[in-house]
């Protein structure tokens, strides 16, 4: 926009009116808190979300009902914000537990839920991390069922029923267009897949041991270092953020190859803008892809939200100051955050953020 203002210069004289017009119409990223008071707790449930306490919101999605759904790591709950801005608790007891299949939704107990997703049939999936399982509510949200994991930490079961396989602290889940479920099995340094038709689980990426990932190489015998979060783009490619690896990868499932797109592998505070493969990241724990194909990252340990632009191959820091805090509404890059985790790219172009240790849900938007 600065260069447009310079068009107002004639014979060495700066046209102040041109500059004023440019300044007044310049659009930037803003941020607002849409839920939470900044204090951890559960007070204010069934009231206005902005006046209600939250407790470490992690995964966040827009539901098929138009409501915002999120899971709370600190209270082991699943909650919902309706179109009127009212927050309610859907499931979870406020203490850790491990409910058996068939438990009514309102009576369920979870153990450090990390992420939630909706499938094409209107069923809500829950990453029940410390129970080492992926759970699901029925389409009527009445009963709980397990779709992967035995509840015992470990690694086993490839080639067999997912409900008989062991997982090790699953952190993220996403579904492809066929309804197959992809899991970040971070404790095993693997990405695993549950077939929608057969329920059989297989490993699609990782060796089971942490290590540097070979760029552009086959998925076969290629290690991962802390696979943490997943999302699919419009081409059906799987995007993966690695927590300990501090990198962002694109996986071509048809060709079974993995490509580095961002992150030097060095841990550090991201620059305001940097060439993608030279960018430093610090524990990325959320991935979301917007309608334009940009990949958003919750760079948790730098307390920032980043955007990878595949057209320019750059990583830009959109929100956060790099310091941990609970900043005000306003310009996004002036709002301190506190270990954000969950991200969701909404249909209007805004980004929903689970600002975990600020105990807020925030919305990043461009205006």
How does the language model describe each region?
Residues 339-367:
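Blade-level signature of beta-propeller repeat domains, shared across WD40, Kelch, NHL, RCC1
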Residues 81-86, 138-142, 195-199, 252-256, ...:
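Short loop/turn segments that connect beta-strands within beta-propeller blades
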Residues 62-65, 118-121, 175-178, 232-235, ...:
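Residue-level detector of Asp-centered blade-edge/turn motifs that repeat once per structural unit
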Residues 24-56, 86-112, 141-169, 198-226, ...:
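Gly/Pro-rich loop segments of beta-rich domains
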Residues 67-69, 123-125, 180-182, 237-239, ...:
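Conserved beta-propeller blade signature
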Residues 73, 129, 186, 243, ...:
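Short loop/turn segments immediately following the C-termini of beta-strands
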Residues 76-78, 132-134, 189-191, 246-248, ...:
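Structural signal for beta-propeller blades
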């Amino acid at each position: 926009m600065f260069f447009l203002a310079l068009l107002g210069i004639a014979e060495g004289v700066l046209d102040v009116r041109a500059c004023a017009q440019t300044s007044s119409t310049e659009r930037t990223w803003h941020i607002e808190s849409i839920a939470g008071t900044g204090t951890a707790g559960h007070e204010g449930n069934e009231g206005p979300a902005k006046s209600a306490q939250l407790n470490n919101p992690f995964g966040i999605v827009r539901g098929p009902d138009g409501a915002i759904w999120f899971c709370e790591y600190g209270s082991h709950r699943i909650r919902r914000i309706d179109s009127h801005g009212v927050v309610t608790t859907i499931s979870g007891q406020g203490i850790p537990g491990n409910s058996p299949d068939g438990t009514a939704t309102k009576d369920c107990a979870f153990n450090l839920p990390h992420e939630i997703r909706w499938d094409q049939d209107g069923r809500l999936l829950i990453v029940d991390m410390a129970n080492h399982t992926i759970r699901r509510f029925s389409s009527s949200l009445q009963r709980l069922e397990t779709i992967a994991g035995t509840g015992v930490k470990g690694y086993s079961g490839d080639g067999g029923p997912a409900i008989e396989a062991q997982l090790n602290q699953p952190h993220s889940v996403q579904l492809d267009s066929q309804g197959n479920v992809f899991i970040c099995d971070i404790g095993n340094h693997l990405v695993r897949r549950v077939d929608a038709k057969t329920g059989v689980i297989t490993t699609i990426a990782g060796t089971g041991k942490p290590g540097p990932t070979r760029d552009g190489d086959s998925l076969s015998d290629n290690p991962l270092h802390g696979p943490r979060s997943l999302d699919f783009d419009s081409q059906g490619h799987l995007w993966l953020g690695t927590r300990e690896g501090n990198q962002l990868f694109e996986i071509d499932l048809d060709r079974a190859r993995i490509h580095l797109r961002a992150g030097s592998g060095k841990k550090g505070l991201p620059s305001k803008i940097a060439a993608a493969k030279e960018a430093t990241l610090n524990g990325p724990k959320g991935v979301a892809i917007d309608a334009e194909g940009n990949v958003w990252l919750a760079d948790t340990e730098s307390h920032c939200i980043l955007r990878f632009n595949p057209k320019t191959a750059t990583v830009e820091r959109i929100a956060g100051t790099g310091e941990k805090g609970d900043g005000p509404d306003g310009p996004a890059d002036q709002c301190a955050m506190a270990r954000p985790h969950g991200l969701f790219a909404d249909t209007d172009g805004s980004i929903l953020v689970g600002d975990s240790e600020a105990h807020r849900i925030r919305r990043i938007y461009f205006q």
